[in-house]
Swiss-Prot record:
Region annotation (Disordered) ranges: 52-72
Domain of life of the source: Bacteria
Family under the similarity heading: Belongs to the SlyX family.
Database matches in InterPro entries: SlyX
PANTHER family: PROTEIN SLYX
Source organism per UniProt: Escherichia fergusonii (strain ATCC 35469 / DSM 13698 / CCUG 18766 / IAM 14443 / JCM 21226 / LMG 7866 / NBRC 102419 / NCTC 12128 / CDC 0568-73)
UniProt name for this protein: Protein SlyX
UniProt feature, compositional bias: Polar residues: 55-65
Pfam families to which the protein is assigned, alphabetical: SlyX
Length: 72
């Protein structure tokens, strides 16, 4: 009787392991797709930032152009 119980437990564990492996593979595919999408979005953000900087001159004076405060 104990052998049957042990076999049933082993079969249940094998079944769970199989489902976990499938789930892990699905999650891996999802994570990989998200990483690729994030890389594309970073590239787009970098390009947009460069375009924005190139199209608008800064209204903020550089440190060398800035006059010192009156207490100096």
């Amino acid at each position: 009787m104990q052998d049957l119980s042990m076999e049933a437990r082993l079969a249940e564990l094998e079944s769970r392991l199989a489902f976990q492996e499938i789930t892990i593979e699905e999650l891996n595919v999802t994570v990989t797709a998200h990483e690729m999408e994030m890389a594309k979005l970073r590239d787009h953000l970098r390009l947009l930032t460069e375009k924005l900087k190139a199209s608008q001159p800064s209204n903020i004076a550089s440190q060398a152009e800035e006059t010192p405060p009156p207490h100096y």
